[in-house]
Regions:
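Terminal peptide-recognition signature
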Residues: 66, 75, 79, 138, ...
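Catalytic histidine site
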Residues: 45-111, 117, 141-143, 179, ...
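Catalytic nucleophile loop of clan PA
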Residues: 229-260
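Boundary at the C-terminal end of the N-terminal hydrophobic targeting segment
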Residues: 36-40
């Protein structure tokens, strides 16, 4: 399927038992809303289609995580800057990348696979980064029209290699919570592809399937608008979304609060210092992502 393929955008029936829902053909647009009290949405904590939320980003031999974010006129791939760029923040980690995610229907095995020409996307102004907060957005498609007439077309440099019939999961900007509204002690779920796990190729781990970690918001840094999580992450998790869970009388509400940017090491040993994973992680607040998205007209 070439890059000139027209993608049709439409809404599904929006059943009340979905916390993350809405559809684009190829894009399953998320509404993160409360599930009514007393209503059983699913046998698990989150709806089945949410397990397909994270995106695996492959650049050469390196990998990272990300997620799709949709506005009225654009579709973006959100990730950490260091997933795409070398430490100088000017040199791309590679000229080509692949973005892989699973179908919104967990029974469908077809992946959504996009080939990204990072060099072309960068030269055309479709990659924008925030060096201070280590977040990046890649515009992958333009949306035109309204209602039933809405269409989504990939930008130059993006080629759809395969697409599941049921679409794939993405989020709308209205599902995002800004830094000022993040609540310390609330539960969070981190989605991503921690590729450094099982370095001896443990057969029980499917490296092309995302893993979830559950933790809490341990603290915040107002100056940097960053969030400290009591939740272990590993190389490969960078760029993945952090979803906060809040509960009230109406049920559970899910909001995207950040992007994983690093784990917090701790030093152990006397004569020989060894850095280990402390179990804490840092996420950039979504304010920086929203600011980048707002620069696209």
């Amino acid at each position: 399927m070439g890059s000139d393929q027209t993608w049709v955008l439409f809404d599904n029936m929006r059943p009340r038992n979905h916390a993350l829902r809405g559809i684009l053909i190829f894009f399953w647009c998320i509404d993160l809303v409360a599930v009514a009290s007393g209503q059983t949405a699913t046998s698990r904590l989150i709806p089945d289609d949410n397990l397909s939320y994270p995106v695996l980003i492959r650049i050469g031999t390196t990998t990272g995580s990300g997620f799709y974010l949709t506005t009225e006129r654009h579709v973006f791939l959100v990730t950490a800057t260091h997933v795409l760029y070398e430490p100088d923040r000017r040199t791309l980690n590679g000229m080509q990348a692949e973005a892989l995610s699973y179908a919104s229907d967990p029974k469908e095995r077809t992946q959504a696979v996009f080939r990204l020409d990072l060099k072309a996307l960068s030269e055309n102004g479709n990659i924008r980064i925030d060096n201070l907060h280590d977040v990046a957005v890649v515009r992958v498609a333009m949306v035109t029209g309204e209602g039933a007439a809405m269409r989504s077309r990939p930008v130059p440099g993006v080629v759809a290699r395969s697409a599941p019939k049921s679409g794939y999961v993405t989020a709308g900007t209205h599902t995002v919570k800004r830094f000022a509204d993040v609540l310390v002690s609330n539960e969070v779920i981190v989605f991503g592809y921690p590729s450094s796990l099982g370095v001896t190729n443990i057969p029980q781990l499917d490296y092309f399937r995302p893993l979830l970690r559950k933790g809490i918001v341990a603290g915040t840094n107002e100056a940097l608008k960053s969030i400290v999580l009591d939740c272990a992450v590993y190389p490969g998790n960078s760029g993945g979304p952090v979803v906060e869970l809040t509960r009230d009388a109406t049920g559970t509400r899910f909001r995207i609060i950040g992007v994983i940017i690093q784990y917090v090491p701790f030093e152990q040993g006397d004569a020989t210092k060894v850095l280990s994973n402390s179990g804490y992680a840092v996420a950039a607040g979504m304010d920086a992502v929203l600011d980048l998205v707002a620069t696209f007209k």
